[in-house]
Regions:
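Flexible, glycine/threonine-enriched loop-and-boundary segments that flank and lead into catalytic domains
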Residues: 1-15, 67
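Conserved nucleotide-binding/hydrolysis micro-motifs of P-loop NTPases
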Residues: 2, 23-28, 81-83
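Conserved phosphate-donor/acceptor-positioning beta-strand/loop module used by diverse small-molecule
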Residues: 9-34
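Alpha-helical elements of the RecA-like P-loop NTPase motor core of helicases
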Residues: 4-7, 30, 90
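PAPS-dependent sulfotransferases, especially Golgi type II membrane carbohydrate sulfotransferases
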Residues: 12, 32-75, 83-149
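Short acidic donor-binding/metal-coordinating loop in glycosyltransferase active sites
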Residues: 78
Length: 149
């Protein structure tokens, strides 16, 4: 939810480099809706309609900040990352000004602790197909994601 603070971040930390991972909105909605988030401020995830509304607000805000701060925001397309991991990862590493290491292609080997609802996924290799998982539930969504197709 850091996207809500981009204006503050850019003002307080003018040298900050912001990374925006953009993903298929239906996949984002499904991933949020199917995951239990006990934290305050994430109650929208209990309703598919509220989740869709929240994702639309996120997209609108990111479009705004992308036009206002285009030189400070690097957009990384998740689906492109899964198709061409090396190319997209090198672009990201170059943007943030770090040296390239082959280990960047194996984030699943990093043993550092993580605190995320997707803690199991970060221990897997980057793979294709996760953005389509929602489709097997499409018959039960009553057209909720049609606006994304």
């Amino acid at each position: 939810q850091n996207f809500r603070y981009i204006g503050l971040i850019a003002t307080a930390l003018p040298e900050a480099k912001i990374i925006h991972v953009k993903r298929d909105p239906a996949a984002v909605c499904w991933a949020n809706y199917k995951t239990f988030f006990p934290s305050e401020g994430l109650g929208y995830c209990f309703s598919i309609e509220d989740t869709i509304h929240y994702v639309r607000l996120y997209e609108d805000l990111m479009e705004f900040w992308g036009s206002e701060l285009s030189n400070k925001i690097h957009t990384l397309n998740y689906e492109q990352l899964t198709v061409n991991q090396e190319k997209e990862t090198k672009r990201l590493i170059d943007y943030i000004g770090l040296d390239w290491h082959e280990a960047c292609l194996s984030p699943q080997d990093n043993k550092r602790g993580v605190s995320t609802a997707s803690s199991i996924q970060v221990r897997q290799k980057v793979y294709q197909g996760s953005s389509q998982k929602w489709k097997k539930y499409e018959p039960f969504l009553n057209g909720a994601f049609d606006q994304f197709l």
